């Protein structure tokens, strides 16, 4: 189960054209998003540590997204 709220994912699905969205579909999208976001965050933290920083910067996120 995801820690993220499901309503924003229902809105995203509707924004791209879904007329109706099941709760299960929105929850599944939220879980998938959370998994991807965690991987990006882990990579960004590693990049910040490698640069001997405690603060994760936008540049770390951008670089993590490229990997």
Curated annotation (Swiss-Prot):
UniProt-annotated location(s): Cytoplasm; Chromosome
Pfam families: CBFD_NFYB_HMF (PF00808)
Sorted UniProt keywords: Chromosome, Cytoplasm, DNA-binding, Plasmid
Organism of derivation: Methanocaldococcus jannaschii (strain ATCC 43067 / DSM 2661 / JAL-1 / JCM 10045 / NBRC 100440) (Methanococcus jannaschii)
Chain spans, region Interaction with DNA: 20-22, 54-57
Assembly description: Homodimer or heterodimer with another histone. Dimers then assemble into higher oligomers, with the DNA wrapped around the protein core.
Function of the molecule: Binds and compact DNA (95 to 150 base pairs) to form nucleosome-like structures that contain positive DNA supercoils. Increases the resistance of DNA to thermal denaturation (in vitro).
Superkingdom as given in the UniProt entry: Archaea
Keyword hit for DNA-binding: yes
Feature type site, description Interaction with DNA: 14
Gene3D superfamilies for the chain: Histone, subunit A
Family per similarity comment: Belongs to the archaeal histone HMF family.
PANTHER family: ARCHAEAL HISTONE A (PTHR47828:SF1)
Gene Ontology CC annotations of this record: chromosome; cytoplasm
Main location: cytoplasm
Keyword set includes Ubl conjugation: no
SMART domains from the UniProt entry: TAF (SM00803)
Coiled coil: none
Protein name: Probable archaeal histone 4
Molecular function in Gene Ontology: DNA binding; protein heterodimerization activity
NCBIfam families tied to this protein: archaea_histone (NF043032)
